[in-house]
Amino acid sequence: MTITPQNLIALLPLLIVGLTVVVVMLSIAWRRNHFLNATLSVIGLNAALVSLWFVGQAGAMDVTPLMRVDGFAMLYTGLVLLASLATCTFAYPWLEGYNDNKDEFYLLVLIAALGGILLANANHLASLFLGIELISLPLFGLVGYAFRQKRSLEASIKYTILSAAASSFLLFGMALVYAQSGDLSFVALGKNLGDGMLNEPLLLAGFGLMIVGLGFKLSLVPFHLWTPDVYQGAPAPVSTFLATASKIAIFGVVMRLFLYAPVGDSEAIRVVLAIIAFASIIFGNLMALSQTNIKRLLGYSSISHLGYLLVALIALQTGEMSMEAVGVYLAGYLFSSLGAFGVVSLMSSPYRGPDADSLFSYRGLFWHRPILAAVMTVMMLSLAGIPMTLGFIGKFYVLAVGVQTHLWWLVGAVVVGSAIGLYYYLRVAVSLYLHAPEQPGRDAPSNWQYSAGGIVVLISALLVLVLGVWPQPLISIVRLAMPLM
């Protein structure tokens, strides 16, 4: 197969991030300079974001049998790049107080971003697996980056071992699917499934094992047990990446698989997914109720958010409405999570041992950092799905899709889950306005709003509010990103 200039333009984000990895690697080898390597990483990610405009001009195309570049791939690539960019900006002040090697952090984030972009473009089970491994392997190192703390090291070991087990399930599932259908590309799988092959036991077993592997990566119940521990143990900027880029990229590729290969047409698979969605929504919210650690709380809340998204995935037969729901919901989830984890990162910067993640650290924050407290409040309201925030628009879409496809008990679960979620999100928001303790523990720097991380947090808050009141620009972008079959 010959690679044309058009193909190269379509792969620009991937090539730019790949080139940035090489440049940062050479820069580290030449001379360790934290500021220089952080700047190079941010420039590379920004250049990749800008290149999406040129990709859009080139139009949709298949680049090699493994990848398809279209509006859908561009939307998810953009979201992954934004999350990676935010991770780098939050990491810079955090690493300022870190005594070991700082520069490799950016290298690992860039490699993980590469995996995310590959997943967004994947059109084949081989590229799906490659992308998942490319995003997971750097995360093993990132989660354990604060390795002098027992908790970070423990989180890294836990995530590594469980992730390896999940990958083996995924790979074995793919092997069974290949044994039955003789093909691994999404489109060919779709054709085979259309020929009434979906009820073959081998194929069902294969897809079942793949659901186990992907369920782990998306932290869906009952494959979620690693989530709160890893979120708590990982450095705050890494938790940001875990909660956003990795989830968004993997959910995007699952969405494309379900679009091309209508796996959801099988009654057995639909029932299994519905049970997983129901359990994730209810369990994630119930477990978050008792948490006094903000990172653990956000970990459990991410389980419930993926449960809500699964409702839209099950309702994929409604076509465009369901895909629109996922796009809008993921954008809202991205900005809300970036803001919430960004505040935790700012409070924990520079690195001085464990992060400022206990609820007590935020008590009375309003009285000495009013803007930061306001940002955190907006993020909590958005995650809870309160009207006038972007989180509400996403949740409304999910409910509309559920009602349209008559998934009544899942719609009920979304409503009950949102009601439970309201309690623990408001608990965090209210504690920001209580009397400050006599001896405040950790605090954000006084000039936090002038730092790159502070600007990212403020922009996230602004987007959550503006798009919550006027979501049309976001909806238009998501509509442009419908994959052309």
From Swiss-Prot:
It catalyses: a quinone + NADH + 5 H(+)(in) = a quinol + NAD(+) + 4 H(+)(out). It is an enzyme of class 7 (translocase). Keywords: Cell inner membrane, Cell membrane, Membrane, NAD, Quinone, Translocase, Transmembrane, Transmembrane helix, Transport, Ubiquinone. The keyword Isomerase does not apply. One of its GO terms (biological process) is ATP synthesis coupled electron transport. It is found in: Cell inner membrane. Its EC number is 7.1.1.-. One of its GO terms (cellular component) is plasma membrane. InterPro entries: NADH-Q_OxRdtase_suN/2, ND/Mrp_TM. It is a multi-pass membrane protein. The chain crosses the membrane at residues 8-28, 35-55, 71-91, 105-125, 127-147, 159-179, 203-223, 235-255, 271-291, 297-317, 326-346, 373-393, 408-430, 455-475. It comes from the Bacteria. NDH-1 is composed of 13 different subunits. Subunits NuoA, H, J, K, L, M, N constitute the membrane sector of the complex. NDH-1 shuttles electrons from NADH, via FMN and iron-sulfur (Fe-S) centers, to quinones in the respiratory chain. The immediate electron acceptor for the enzyme in this species is believed to be ubiquinone. Couples the redox reaction to proton translocation (for every two electrons transferred, four hydrogen ions are translocated across the cytoplasmic membrane), and thus conserves the redox energy in a proton gradient. HAMAP family: NDH1_NuoN_1. Belongs to the complex I subunit 2 family. This is NADH-quinone oxidoreductase subunit N.
